[in-house]
Amino acid sequence: CASCHMPPSQHGGTNHRFAASRDVHMLRSAAKIIGSRDGDELVITFTRRAVGHAFPTGDLFRRLRVLARDAEGNLVSAELGRKTKLGPTADNRPFVRGDQTAIRLPIGSGAATFRVVYERVQHPLTEDESVAIVTESVELARGAIEARGLE
């Protein structure tokens, strides 16, 4: 942990800020994030770059949120993080099971836009993660997907 989160300081020794989730550059360099189309789905692929663990870390108050808007303006989203429940969907963070993770969202055949946002949230009181109160966010990626047949 210390080699990344406590780098050498300008004055000798190491920097004890333990830079991580509040360092925008560090967040944006953790993964290469690419959006592409596969039929009527948006595929967001996360490829590990500068992070030695799942992203975000196991803190339940941090997550990645993928937001996509289809040609009609409809919003679809997915939350990636550790959950307070057991089972196969309890942890869907990138890099839990390898160096590349892909998620899929339905967007239809028209053009679409997407954003990937790192969020700090107050713990949701329901299983619907979309109602969690976001206390801080950093945009990690954004892009546009052409209509099917035009890409």
State where each predicted segment sits:
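Short, conserved sequence motifs used for protein processing/export or organelle targeting and
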Residues: S3, P7-E151
